[in-house]
Amino acid sequence: IAVVASNGIDTLSSGFSGCYMASFRHNGIRYVAHIPTPNNSIKTSWNLAVKNRIIDNVVLFKPTEGLARIPGTIGIWGIITFNDRCYRLDVNENAPPSQAIRGQRIFNSIPRNPILTEIPPIAGGQMP
């Protein structure tokens, strides 16, 4: 699990293919996490932390869930805003005019299509 303290700021993570993104509080500090799903022990540990209230104020979503991939998309990113709104960002390398930066490369986003989609969080904060 990749975790960053993110008090008061929007957080973006890239490379979603089935992973989850979450925000939560632990010892009064707000964090955002990118959680891989192939590993059942991670899923079990996460669900236990939520159930046992080791973490609270949990907002969990899956950027790839329930939406068709927009043609030309080379990557799906997740965004959780400072006020826990969840978004999926479809990124395309070949279409101007908007651009997104990833590492040392600049990727163009898809024009004329809705590329930023708000996703409802998963109720209860546990992975199914």
Region locations from a protein language model:
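Active-site microenvironment for binding and transforming phosphate-containing groups
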Residues: I1-P128
